[in-house]
Amino acid sequence: MAKVVKFPIQPPEKFGFRRVRKKREAPAKRSSQLNLFTGGKVIKLHQLSAFDEALLLDENNDKSAKEHYLKAIEEGDSVADAYCNLGIIESKLRSYPKAIDCFTLSLKEDPRHFESHYNLANLYAEINNLPLAKVHYQTSIVLEPDFPNSYFNLGLTLAMNQEVDAAINTLLEYRRLASDDEHKQVDELIEYLTRAVR
């Protein structure tokens, strides 16, 4: 008899930005064959692409990451990803117009860039532009329907926008996708919203 091992799921970062971690790779030539050599590599900093170097600096909260992302954009290296991560940096600095510009430039490069839609939605929610937050959360759900944070954040946005029935349905979808640890929190929120409707 086989034993199912459940791996721990990291709690979602609700209303938090989602940095692009690595460049998107082209699909493998043979999708039925596993790549056995995707593990760790020892690399030297000067061997990194401009985007990877910027990401490494960004993940270590190095202020020079911003300049390195701009260098990656100039070199044409992961342009959409670089603009997206620049948008996060600008958001953290509360430079909201610059952040919006970065996210939209990312979407100009790749209109289906999930992280840019998700992060733009978080930014619009933060500055209380709920209609635009709603649209970008909905778009992020279309692009990645299994990412639970989009549902949770959309549910909160709908609730703040007085769309309680839609908020409850969206939070129920979040509950379906979320780990068991998250159920209590979302159940309490759903119960509160249900009572508010009555």
Segments (PLM) and residue ranges:
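Helix-start (N-cap) detector for alpha-helical repeat units in TPR-like alpha-solenoids
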Residues: 47, 80-81, 114-115, 148-149, ...
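Alpha-helical segment of the N-proximal tetratricopeptide repeat
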Residues: 43-81, 88-92
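Structural signature of tandem alpha-helical TPR/SEL1-like repeats
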Residues: 59-71, 92-105, 126-139, 161-173, ...
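TPR/TPR-like alpha-solenoid helical repeat scaffolds
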Residues: 156-160, 181-198
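Structural marker of alpha-solenoid helical repeat scaffolds
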Residues: 75, 109, 143, 177-178
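Long, contiguous interaction/recruitment modules in multidomain scaffold/adaptor proteins
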Residues: 1-48
